[in-house]
């Protein structure tokens, strides 16, 4: 017993400063393992047990401060010492190497470009300029149209989660990467094999067991997924750099090559951005189609808004609606439907709710507003968006799918700073928001222009039971909704 106690003391570091009290759900050696396995219940229990909504917990030898409430949320999002790249170690999924000790941060993420931007941030923003998106529209609209035309070959019954996820990956890859990854069937098959591995595999548990890296299946799966993506994109980048033919490709990768970017930076950008650009969109897109299909009044309202936008912007307003969509400019896709925008915010609020990671990279402690407690220098800090997105005050009946809460006359979330965090907030807003909204508008526009949708079972029999999009709240990594099916009725 004495030996075990000495081992425990030697394993647990001393923390200086007036930190929040430790949550009762802390166990020797492993720490608060329910942070991984029961994200929602762990967070709520820790809040209830704390005196002010702030608490400490261990993940192995890693001390983490959990914060909640408006003032702490504002500090978390706006303090310049809170680094989101170094804090990603608390997330545990995606293509970046995380072994439980540190995240290996590539140079594409360092803020060394003009305006304190990173190479990755600069390219993401450039890819979404109107001139660039205009060049991508013909291929991405063709991808979306072909995908929904294929619904007929599936007996007009689809799993919206799977179909929309694939479409999200396809179109995001065109906008931020290279056409060969989608146009060459072998490349696309590999892409659609590796991306789900990276999407749903979390090695966050290695924070508690860093010594177990080489015995961890998720750790090796993430390395396998990352290496697979590297082997996929590297030959494409290298081939582009050798081409001197005046007839050149016209996609983002070619722009990077023409700019003289290094192969290493381009390869790492493609690997990371193909994943990141669709990480949440691939989950939310299917939830959007599913949710609206179960609300026929919203579906009809959106259909009418799509028709109005097409009539205003299409090259030939007398053409069939789906043909009108093929000719729409970027401006039309950005202003497609106010109702879609409300639904999008509600789906994001309900589905994209998860712990966020930051590291206090400063040399001094950060005081938590409204308390005498601190986030220690060099320490990890976590905020779970369920604190705001499932707040009874900001979102009455938070488990109810209610897009109207974002409309005029409601907007209860505006009572507090950063009351909606669906697009990031503070110092780190989402850089890909423009494309994300266009992409979602595009998928739903073609879906509703071509069909009326209703809920069904796998065999096509009617199913009017609506399952609000809350099932991912306890999962280690975002995953696609399961066992949801829709039936499409072609519009006349």
Curated annotation (Swiss-Prot):
CDD domains: cytochrome_P450. Induction: Expression is positively regulated by the cluster-specific transcription factor MYCFIDRAFT_198930 and is up-regulated during banana leaves infection. It holds the Pfam family p450. Its EC number is 1.14.13.-. Its cofactor is heme. It is found in: Membrane. Its main location: membrane. Keywords: Glycoprotein, Heme, Iron, Membrane, Metal-binding, Monooxygenase, Oxidoreductase, Transmembrane, Transmembrane helix. InterPro entries: Cyt_P450 (IPR001128), Cyt_P450_sf (IPR036396). It comes from the Eukaryota. Pathway: Secondary metabolite biosynthesis. The chain crosses the membrane at residues 269-293. It is a single-pass membrane protein. GO terms for cellular component: membrane. It is an enzyme of class 1 (oxidoreductase). Cytochrome P450 monooxygenase; part of the gene cluster that mediates the biosynthesis of an emodin derivative that may be involved in black Sigatoka disease of banana. The pathway begins with the synthesis of atrochrysone thioester by the polyketide synthase PKS8-1. The atrochrysone carboxyl ACP thioesterase MYCFIDRAFT_190111 then breaks the thioester bond and releases the atrochrysone carboxylic acid from PKS8-1. Belongs to the cytochrome P450 family. This is Cytochrome P450 monooxygenase MYCFIDRAFT_204672. The lineage of its organism: Eukaryota, Fungi, Dikarya, Ascomycota, Pezizomycotina.
